[in-house]
Amino acid sequence: MPGPCNCIETNVCICGTGCSGKCCQCGDACKCASGCGCSGCKVVCRCSGTCACGCDCTGPINCKCESGCSCK
């Protein structure tokens, strides 16, 4: 049985308990709310300081951070 967020096998992205799945995308772009765990996710986007990644962030190459923030 695949993990709850093994997006490649299930095509479903389920975020950790109490975590928002807003803007969550399946496949290689599986993503949960900031600070939430999702086993099987392969996307890493780090924004500067306390800034969060934007909804259309799908990886380091097109990392999108909140307005006025930069991706590092």
Swiss-Prot record:
InterPro entries, per database record: Metalthion_mollusc
Annotated Cd(2+) 6 binding sites: C53, C65, C69, C71
Binding site for Cd(2+) 5: C47, C51, C53, C57
Native source organism of the sequence: Mytilus edulis (Blue mussel)
Purpose of the protein: The metallothioneins are involved in the cellular sequestration of toxic metal ions.
Protein name, per record: Metallothionein 20-III isoform A
Domain of life where this protein originates: Eukaryota
Keyword Cell membrane belongs to the record: no
MF-aspect GO terms: metal ion binding
Binding site for Cd(2+) 1: C15, C19, C32, C36
Residues noted as binding Cd(2+) 3 in the record, renumbered to the chain: C26, C30, C32, C41
